[in-house]
Amino acid sequence: MRRNVEVFINNQRVDLFDFEDINIVDSVQDVRDIAKIFVPYSREFTVPASKNNNKIFKHYYNNDIVNGFDARFKISAVIKVNGMVYKNGRVTLLNSSLKNNRPVNYKLVFYSKTIDFKTLLSDDLLEDMDTSILSKFNIEYNAQNVFDGFNYGYSLIGENIVANDVPVENSDLIIPFISTNSHYYYDDNVAGISPLEGDSESRNVNFNGGVAYPNNVVSGVNWKDLRPSLKLPILMQAIEEKYGISFVSDFFTTDAFNKLYIWLNNDKGLYGEERTVGTDFSEFTLDNGNDERPITTTSSVFYRLLLTVNIDDVNDDYELNVTNNNDSKTIYTSTAKGTNTFEIPLLFRGGGIYIYDLNFEITGVESNSITLSAKLELFSNGLQSTSNYSFVDAATDGVFNIRKNMPKVKVIDFLTGLFKMFNLTAYVNDDDNIVVDTLDDYYRKGSTVDITRFTKNEESTVSRNKLYSQIDFMFEEPKTFATINSNELSRDEFGNERIDNTNNDPELSALLAFDGGKYEVAPKFEKMQYERMTDQSNPTLLQNFCWGWCVTDDQKATLTKPILHYTENVDVDVIPLTVQMGFDPTTGQANIPVSYYFRPSNSLSTSTTLGQSLHFGSEEDEFYTSLGSNETSLFNMYWKNTILAIYDEKSRITTYKANLPISIANTIKLNDVVVVNRKKYRINKIDINITTGDANLELVTYRKLVRYNGFTVDNDGFTVDSTLITVDKTI
């Protein structure tokens, strides 16, 4: 029996063909592509070119109509079945068919309610989010304010950011012990020799009772080495504000997320001293003229760029490097002092066209105030047009602008990275909120639906999963000293994990049906390894000081991909290590004592308990090494069920045909457990004809979700053949 299906577009009822079926395909996460999120959509369907529909689609077939139907945009739509709302979403008009120059029909596709993040976020960077919430955390960057943030952190009270005067767990803004330039160590002997050989300045953090070191040796933590970290939930609030969206998530209330911080550093070296200012031309503001970006040259079209570097110190010397992001070629280099204008030719370099995506890097500057202005001249048989652009550096006026100091990453890549780390999935609820869950928790919230009597058992197919021969869980290539050297010494990759299903055995690889190839889960974040200090005079004695060093393996200041971290506000004078840390507020010799400081951490471990780590693989906590390897990894906590379900020997993909009643078709959810003939399945995909109720179901063998508890996993009788799936720590 055919059901009464209605389609409404912008609250207008669409005329339908009596014979036309509408099929909805629904899948949340395909087991054959473990990091791809799907959105319910319809197969193409046609509606008549009736008088009513012509009015709705504004005679789309006639492109002479002014202000006609704009098919570039999806239009709000609702599908009802027998008077009940089935799906809310949007419709895309694909085309209009004509016969003898008269309209016959319109072809449509329906998409369920969702958020098109790629369109919404476009190519926006985190630093593009000019929001009120982020502006509240801008602070004057000076020795006192840095000391306050390093000691106890800042909290948002009302509309104001206020320095805490006592330790506050999970402060909104902190300044962790991550150095952008200097090397740090502890030595009880203040006349001792630095343990480091190289160009970097080494500083002993021993407070030494506030007494200056002999021979005027600098010591203590230099405030200009430090940058703030912002609590990640605040950044998520900024994304909500910027794009008019709302996240609802139990996961966002967990410590694993709520205690995350993002390090705010997009400048090399000391703050305000010998720093690097880097920016892309795409980040300049167009002041007047036509926007010629991207700059496209041909054999008859070229450009000239007049770049003016405005610096407030006439004696500040620096080097300018201009490169093309498209091919990494150097376009222009020059050295100068003070304010200067540079003439940069942008000529055709062969091929049909040559496109310039310019990056400017100014190194060695000390000035706080730097602005760039650019005049772009277009030539084609002479000068044709001129456009003017400008850029203001983040450090202007001595204010640390939170937004402008965000790591250089697209908003979409930042969110995608979070989803990959914690195996998250998302959907839009009836209140237009974006519900975010870990995939495991999403499935745990489902119900059980028995559809046995509605299935056509004579028509079913059982097949196997496509298997990956190797799955790599990996962060970006490390750029920092400790991580690079650790990887070389251990022949391991810090924080990464590899699932190697061949055990590096060519014969086994030839026998097993690994037809899924290799797969990567690769968030665009970087891992930094931290170091707990020992006493250089007594290397067996650990100190309460743990820090990170943002320099390359040859000790040069560097920029990293985004770094996420946890933190612990450490009492530096705790028994038995009654040693105080010195803080240098003047870049001189006399220090002030630090009571507490924020140590950066890759886990939520405490002195007695290993907590959630930010590694895919098992690693020791750099501060609490005595606790041993931390198995509370991203893989164990968020990915293990997904992977084991794929490689379970009993795992099958079973397809059934069914005719689902309205009561089930309108309410079944993708996280429901489906029962057929007393066997449980998870839903991989549903393709349902909502007009007739006929459905094709692609189901995956049900496997009970297990929770990771400390060092053991209850697999409920499930075993993994060690020759089939192994964890390789040597990638």
Give the positions of each predicted feature.
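Noncatalytic modules at the cell exterior or secretory-pathway interfaces
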Residues: 303-305, 346-365
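Surface-exposed ligand/attachment interfaces on beta-rich extracellular proteins
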Residues: 284-298
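Extended, low-complexity, turn-rich repeat/linker tracts enriched in Gly/Pro/Ser/Thr and Asp/Glu
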Residues: 309-319, 365-368
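Polar, S/T/G-rich
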Residues: 1-285, 370-397, 402-421, 430-431, ...
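Short beta-strand-centered aromatic/proline hotspots
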Residues: 87-95, 679-689
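Extracellular carbohydrate recognition and processing domains
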Residues: 286-289, 329-349
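Viral virion structural and adsorption modules
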Residues: 706-731
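Short, surface-exposed beta-strand/strand-loop-strand elements in extracellular ectodomains
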Residues: 317-328
